[in-house]
């Protein structure tokens, strides 16, 4: 049972947090901020220090090649350096933008956002905005624009749930063959991901996953019932 002071604290916390429709009015997502997806990508690249560092090296090498194009020996060395730098740039870009953020507190934050806000439709924009701010404040991303839109955030959440659930199902179905598995194959999830993770071994996190999954399904069902009130949707 909560004490009067605890009840007061809960009420104050609730009052301090703006409601979803008020947040939505001030939500600034990349799809609303940038004129195109290309301009968004260029902005992200410009604020990623490792990528900008590699670009500066490549531009410098190109300038040196133009400057010393009459010197064959120097040109060969510079061209080889340019090739290596270009390959390094691709690796850095793939590592930076191709790898999903899987920091545990970030995933907990996302699950709790879904549980608390019961998002559907445009409400995912609010969740995306809050997650973008969280990632930026925690220095897990270079800009406050990780999720391009609410749709992208919803897709990330759906992928997270699928990976965790598919891992759970594969774990339970393979218990009988556990003794014959190699340590390497036993440690992998679908798609070779090792990291949807410690979630399955953490009962609290799994409880969040199950709760968020249930609430998201209910929110989606309610959303479509409101969109089509005469359709008698289940």
UniProtKB/Swiss-Prot annotation:
Membrane topology: Multi-pass membrane protein
Location of the region described as Required for resistance to killer toxin K28, a protein-toxin encoded by the M28 virus in the Swiss-Prot/TrEMBL record: 68-75, 147-234
Claim: Membrane is one of the keywords in the record: yes
Gene Ontology, cellular component aspect: endosome membrane; fungal-type vacuole membrane; Golgi apparatus
Region feature (Disordered): 168-187
Function: Confers resistance to killer toxin K28, a protein-toxin encoded by the M28 virus that uses S.cerevisiae as a host. Probably acts against K28 after endocytosis of the protein-toxin.
Additional record remark: Present with 1835 molecules/cell in log phase SD medium.
Stated name of the protein: Protein-toxin resistance protein KTD1
Protein source organism: Saccharomyces cerevisiae (strain ATCC 204508 / S288c) (Baker's yeast)
Gene that specifies this protein: KTD1
């Amino acid at each position: 049972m909560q004490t009067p002071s605890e009840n007061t604290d809960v009420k104050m916390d609730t009052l301090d947090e703006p409601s979803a429709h008020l947040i939505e009015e001030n939500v600034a997502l990349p799809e609303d901020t940038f004129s195109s997806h290309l301009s968004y990508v260029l902005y992200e690249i410009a604020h990623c220090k490792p990528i900008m560092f590699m670009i500066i090296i490549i531009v410098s090498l190109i300038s040196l090649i133009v400057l010393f194009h009459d010197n064959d020996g120097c040109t060969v060395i510079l061209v080889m350096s340019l090739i290596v730098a270009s390959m390094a740039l691709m690796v850095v870009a793939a590592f930076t933008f191709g790898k999903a953020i899987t920091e545990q507190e970030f995933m907990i934050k996302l699950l709790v956002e879904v549980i608390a806000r019961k998002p559907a439709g445009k409400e995912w924009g609010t969740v995306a905005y809050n997650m973008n701010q969280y990632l930026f404040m925690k220095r897990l991303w270079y800009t406050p624009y990780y999720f391009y839109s609410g749709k992208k955030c919803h897709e990330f959440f759906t992928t997270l749930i699928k990976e965790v659930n598919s891992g759970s199902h594969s774990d339970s179905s393979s218990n009988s063959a556990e003794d014959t598995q190699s340590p390497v194959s036993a440690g992998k999830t679908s798609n070779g991901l090792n990291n949807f993770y410690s979630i399955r071994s953490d009962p609290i996190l799994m409880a969040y996953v199950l709760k968020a999954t249930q609430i998201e399904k209910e929110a989606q069902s309610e959303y479509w019932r409101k969109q089509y009130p005469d359709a008698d949707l289940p």
